Amino acid sequence: MNVAVRLKAAAVWLCRIGHSRGFGIQSPTDYWMVRYVINEHWPYYQYETLGRHDDWLTRKMGRLCFRLANWLQPSVVESRDYRNYLQAGCRKTVFGESSELVVMPLENCSQDRLSYIYNKVSPRSVLVVTGISKVRRLWRQIVDDERTGITFDLYYCGIVMFDKKRHKRNYIVNF
């Protein structure tokens, strides 16, 4: 692995150390989400076989998608990437247009695409956007949009939830 990439990853992790493992999160539901879905460290049954030949970031993001699919158990997932991980997390999942779990890169995303997603989501929907560190302005727009609810900034990706019964919050998480 490239030494510069590893050093940058270590620097990002150190800058976010105060946001580790749910520290500072007062909501029990959000704390549970950070501890037992986002930052779960116990090895899952599929970890040995999944992503054996992937680079460290693809494997890290794939394992997050695996845990999200395992937690949500969606019937349909919309994603171009991480399909093996998502399928392993929920075997009954099929891929197509979905409002349950959407995984998409933010770099090539338009406002029209986001509006389309916002108009079809339910309170149980989860949107995972990758590459938020490259397009911070667009990520801030997603966080600030009144149609989104709880958001988690993981530096490499963002997780958006749409349950409007809960107070709108943005959490920075050391992932």
Task: Give residue ranges: language-model regions.
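A short alpha-helical cap/connector motif
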Residues: M1-S125, I132-F175
